[in-house]
């Protein structure tokens, strides 16, 4: 079976994105720019779907459970003229968990534990922030989601 075509859309900007803060699993809402970005993503997706010969109403839509991802999805679907709430939620699509570093900027995380921060920068796939996830953990949960497509 050929690999499915997947259109990924990242959530729009939040104030924490603009400030350089690690959001991870914290539910930080979209800001005004983020809402505009989501609408633009919907318009771009409409063009991609038309180019690829797909009908938006015929493809599945899935989002992370975080509010910023859900609102992005709803704004994208509105731009596609689809029912805004007709999509699935899958927790495996959530952003990487940064544990105790969530809410911090990278300089703040570095200052809190310079040794661990350096190890994490050098080996993101195998080293996690305290209470957070490794990239390997994210790959595993995302891989499980992808295998079910």
Residue positions per predicted region:
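Eukaryotic N-terminal low-complexity, Ser/Thr- and Lys/Arg-rich leader segments
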Residues: 1-2
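Residue-level recognition of specific faces of alpha-helices
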Residues: 5-8, 119
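Active-site-proximal alpha-helix that buttresses catalytic centers in soluble enzyme cores
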Residues: 7-9, 13-82, 136-139
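Phosphate-handling substructures
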Residues: 78-143
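Short, intrinsically disordered, charge-balanced linker/junction segments flanking boundaries
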Residues: 146-149
């Amino acid at each position: 079976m050929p690999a499915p075509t997947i259109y990924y859309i990242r959530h729009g900007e939040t104030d924490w994105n603009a400030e350089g803060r690690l959001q991870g699993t914290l539910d930080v809402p979209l800001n005004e720019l983020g809402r505009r970005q989501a609408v633009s993503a919907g318009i771009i997706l409409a063009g991609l779907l038309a180019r690829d010969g797909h009908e938006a109403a015929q493809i599945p839509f899935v989002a992370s459970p975080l509010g910023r991802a859900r609102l992005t999805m709803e704004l994208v679907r509105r731009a596609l003229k689809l029912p805004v709430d007709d999509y699935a939620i899958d927790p495996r699509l959530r952003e990487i968990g940064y544990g105790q570093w969530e809410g911090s900027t990278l300089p703040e995380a570095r200052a809190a534990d310079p040794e661990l921060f350096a190890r994490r920068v050098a080996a993101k796939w195998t080293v996690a922030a305290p209470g957070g996830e490794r990239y390997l953990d994210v790959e595993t949960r995302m891989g499980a989601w992808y295998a079910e497509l």
